[in-house]
From Swiss-Prot:
Inhibited by serine hydrolase inhibitor FP-biotin and by antipain. This is Protease 4. The gene is sppA. Changing S409A: Loss of activity. It holds the Pfam family Peptidase_S49. Changing G410A: Reduced activity.
Amino acid sequence: MRTLWRFIAGFFKWTWRLLNFVREMVLNLFFIFLVLVGVGIWMQVSGGDSKETASRGALLLDISGVIVDKPDSSQRFSKLSRQLLGASSDRLQENSLFDIVNTIRQAKDDRNITGIVMDLKNFAGGDQPSMQYIGKALKEFRDSGKPVYAVGENYSQGQYYLASFANKIWLSPQGVVDLHGFATNGLYYKSLLDKLKVSTHVFRVGTYKSAVEPFIRDDMSPAAREADSRWIGELWQNYLNTVAANRQIPAEQVFPGAQGLLEGLTKTGGDTAKYALENKLVDALASSAEIEKALTKEFGWSKTDKNYRAISYYDYALKTPADTGDSIGVVFANGAIMDGEETQGNVGGDTTAAQIRDARLDPKVKAIVLRVNSPGGSVTASEVIRAELAAARAAGKPVVVSMGGMAASGGYWISTPANYIVANPSTLTGSIGIFGVITTVENSLDSIGVHTDGVSTSPLADVSITRALPPEAQLMMQLSIENGYKRFITLVADARHSTPEQIDKIAQGHVWTGQDAKANGLVDSLGDFDDAVAKAAELAKVKQWHLEYYVDEPTFFDKVMDNMSGSVRAMLPDAFQAMLPAPLASVASTVKSESDKLAAFNDPQNRYAFCLTCANMR
């Protein structure tokens, strides 16, 4: 018996030692990881990640991930993220549109940069106005006499759009230029909510305000289908026209439709690369070795890199413009508009208003450019931003809005105080309408034997997700939504020198492209960010200026924690999706995207000016 007790005691003793060893090892590894991340970030902050070209060569435009107006603060340490998690982790990588454009423009005047090579295999896309803006910079580079080349084993639709701005496009002999058109799709939950016995109460104004349809339908309404088909067709035609002009071929040759594409592939025996070459989508078919040889002849050989001489976009040092005294403040509204402080990928009403206020109070800032790339969101937060922008204009500082890929619904609400609005022809804007959704689960609880009861001094004191929504509360909510809509169209009417009745005819939640918005008087001119800045300078009557970007600078500790937590947040869904078959992984990604949108809905009055179809555009 004593031997047995010794064995049991020994077993627990050694088990405890093993657990203690594992605990200490995990803590030590965590500490080492923390130190490495901190050192890596310190090196990047101190400029260790940038280097000048020591000799003449190409700028390698090897964009990895997506293009956004304003990357999340932790994304500025992208090199460290790529080193820790691999370049394929494009989920983690956000690239500043303006950094890319400024880099290309700096390279144009850099004697050590003799050309650009676009290697876009890890490029995950961006909205059409953003890529047009990059294309403009690439054209300026070409016009300076320096060549632009595009290389790729395959080209997705977004990758090919950028590649079309090149002097020459190479494609692998086994590659494909994958053109298929645009789509906007979303998930619809009505049947699911019915099965769960969830009661959905929808309040809206606007025939075309389709953001609530997922809660009350299992498919698109005819009105939403008609409206979305129109603007998505316009965007696709803009895509084809741009590529056709770049390649100097007819738009019908870029994409002849599904049937025409099938006939063309039949003639080439299914050889997608041959089809691309014969239809002048690319200039040459070549292997990696052949492309390397051609680029080496153009740019020279690097003994260190054992490749043609080039410097990555991520290593090329972007110079800070000189402080000329006067400045034009640039404030970003990038993402869904939320009440409160800014979160990753979303616009915080309080954060953005504070940035506008800082620009208003800075005597060196002579004008403000609000860069909007948002499908809208919280009405309360939108009004907070709008009011602060109106205060800046009232203080005598010109306000110009530059619309990016989207400036819809709440994104248009915050644009109304501007002296001048510049939109891209492919901007999605309008969507002037308001909605609210309240779900209650009293029937769900009842079906499993859970009931709610109590007393209250009025029906309004007993509003809860676990009880049926009182009729009085429903009527009050609808009145609030209708009042918000009247407020919206009145703001637009005052800003556009029109009447609420006239604005109502083009509102009702209707989405417009920038081109149509110009025709309807919702914007002042068509152009890009450069045009908006030039207009701001003109209104402020300044001859020399520099741009002052208003972004929240995180502390060093925040940078360390953001990289760590951001990496973990990104790796977990990636790891989960990696274990799923491809079709299920795609569904999981869609579900996560939908849940992220719902998480951004935090308006205290449950009122939203949000364009769901704009956010679903791809």
